[in-house]
């Protein structure tokens, strides 16, 4: 019997409009796709620090148009001060 092939998620890097609060917390507000479509984030329902596979980023559970999705923030190399990180969503290939 054949075992099902496990599909690994593919990272899709996206532009995100976000705010920092007065305590340094990062809050995503909207996702902008490469084709220009903008999706406002209605709510952030959960946050998991260090959730990416290499523990270098965070996972936000967000709600867009009533649907729950995950949005990830991947921190970049600390040697480049002007680049804090980048955002991605996952798509199963």
Regions found by a protein language model. Give the residues of each.
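Cysteine-centric segments in proteins
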Residues: 1-93
């Amino acid at each position: 019997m054949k075992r099902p092939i496990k599909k690994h998620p593919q990272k899709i890097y996206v532009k995100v409009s976000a705010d920092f609060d007065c305590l340094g917390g990062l809050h995503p507000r909207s996702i902008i796709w490469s084709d220009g479509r903008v999706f406002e984030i209605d709510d952030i329902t959960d946050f998991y620090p260090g959730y990416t596979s290499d523990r270098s980023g965070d996972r936000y559970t967000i709600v867009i148009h009533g649907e729950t999705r995950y949005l990830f923030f991947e921190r970049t190399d600390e040697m480049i001060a002007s680049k804090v990180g980048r955002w991605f969503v996952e798509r199963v290939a």
